[in-house]
């Protein structure tokens, strides 16, 4: 078996199929498993997807939310076992793949139109 086929076989077994389809502009609730010492808990991070990048096992997505008036962005690997589940709350209507312009917008200007 060639190296390429071997790598492809290993990564295919690691890919997750239980996650919903989503794209930039969608509002997600990401349930992340957090380990603190011997305890484990689930933390929910809700925000707008501003980008998806990569493909295969190394695919990542970035979620942005406003917390206490401060913008917080968190990048997650898509196929990590640390993600318990992803819920799509709203489907956003955007015409860009990368929504970096949201970083400079404040308040109602930063809203994204919902797909009906």
UniProtKB/Swiss-Prot annotation:
<dbReference type="Pfam" id="PF01245">
    <property type="entry name" value="Ribosomal_L19"/>
</dbReference>
<dbReference type="GO" id="GO:0003735">
    <property type="term" value="F:structural constituent of ribosome"/>
</dbReference>
<dbReference type="InterPro" id="IPR001857">
    <property type="entry name" value="Ribosomal_bL19"/>
</dbReference>
<dbReference type="InterPro" id="IPR018257">
    <property type="entry name" value="Ribosomal_bL19_CS"/>
</dbReference>
<keyword id="KW-0689">Ribosomal protein</keyword>
<comment type="similarity">
    <text>Belongs to the bacterial ribosomal protein bL19 family.</text>
</comment>
<keyword id="KW-0687">Ribonucleoprotein</keyword>
<protein>
    <recommendedName>
        <fullName>Large ribosomal subunit protein bL19</fullName>
    </recommendedName>
</protein>
<dbReference type="GO" id="GO:0006412">
    <property type="term" value="P:translation"/>
</dbReference>
<dbReference type="InterPro" id="IPR008991">
    <property type="entry name" value="Translation_prot_SH3-like_sf"/>
</dbReference>
<dbReference type="GO" id="GO:0022625">
    <property type="term" value="C:cytosolic large ribosomal subunit"/>
</dbReference>
<dbReference type="InterPro" id="IPR038657">
    <property type="entry name" value="Ribosomal_bL19_sf"/>
</dbReference>
<comment type="function">
    <text>This protein is located at the 30S-50S ribosomal subunit interface and may play a role in the structure and function of the aminoacyl-tRNA binding site.</text>
</comment>
């Amino acid at each position: 078996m060639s190296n390429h086929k071997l790598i492809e076989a290993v990564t295919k077994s690691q890919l997750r199929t239980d996650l919903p389809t989503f794209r930039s502009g969608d509002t997600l609730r990401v349930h992340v498993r957090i380990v603190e010492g011997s305890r484990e808990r689930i933390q929910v991070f809700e925000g707008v997807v501003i980008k998806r990048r990569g493909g295969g096992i190394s695919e990542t997505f970035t979620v942005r939310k406003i917390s206490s008036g401060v913008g917080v962005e968190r990048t997650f690997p898509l196929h990590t076992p640390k993600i318990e589940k992803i819920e799509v709350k709203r489907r956003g209507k955007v015409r860009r793949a990368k929504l970096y312009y949201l970083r400079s917008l404040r308040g109602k200007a930063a809203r994204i139109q919902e797909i009906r």
